[in-house]
């Protein structure tokens, strides 16, 4: 009887074949892999963004500390001929710095609270005639302060400030 119904096409078959189930499983697996990859990419972008934010906050903080100092030891020209800490005056740490050029050569290999970050500062005399780009051998009324904040997995952020005595 069943054979006769099959020949006549009267049996109503419902359900999925094994091939259809396998195709659906493969397609679902591929779509989940793409979705998980997108989530992972978003997570790494967020982590990189957080590191960049910390890096820029450290840069801004150090620049504010530099701007808070006087232009030079001398209150008027002629300015100091040597740039850097005056160890003879007892300037050995950041809290002892009293003018901008004390930061020349200042370096932190590991920033407190963010040990993966490091900082370097370079101070030079510059002149407007050179477009503030090349350092001058003598004293001028302008100092170029370059602050660089580095991280092992990111490129360094560097900012250059041109500071004058404001006379």
Show which residues each predicted segment covers.
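N-terminal leader/signal peptides at the extreme start of proteins
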Residues: 1-16, 167
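Acidic/proline-rich low-complexity IDRs
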Residues: 4, 26, 35-38, 82, ...
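Intrinsically disordered, low-complexity segments enriched in glycine/proline and serine/threonine
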Residues: 5-7, 11, 23, 53, ...
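Aliphatic-rich helix starts adjacent to a transmembrane/signal segment
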Residues: 16-60
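Low-complexity, Gly/Pro-rich coil/beta segments used as flexible assembly/activation regions
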Residues: 50-167
């Amino acid at each position: 009887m069943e054979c006769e119904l099959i020949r006549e096409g009267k049996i109503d078959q419902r359900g999925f074949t094994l091939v259809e189930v396998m195709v659906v499983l493969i397609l679902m697996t591929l779509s989940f892999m793409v979705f998980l990859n997108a989530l992972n990419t978003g997570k790494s972008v967020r982590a990189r963004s957080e590191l960049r934010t910390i890096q820029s906050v450290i840069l801004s903080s150090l620049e504010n500390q530099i701007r808070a100092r006087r232009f030079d030891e001398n209150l008027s020209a002629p300015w100091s001929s040597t740039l850097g800490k005056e160890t003879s005056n007892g300037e050995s740490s950041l809290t002892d710095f009293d003018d901008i050029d004390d930061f020349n050569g200042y370096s932190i290999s590991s920033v407190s609270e963010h040990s993966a970050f490091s900082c370097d500062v370079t101070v030079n005399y510059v002149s407007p005639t050179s477009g503030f780009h090349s350092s001058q051998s003598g004293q001028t009324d302008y100092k170029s302060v370059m602050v660089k904040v580095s991280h092992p997995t990111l490129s360094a952020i560097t900012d250059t400030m041109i500071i004058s005595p404001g006379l």
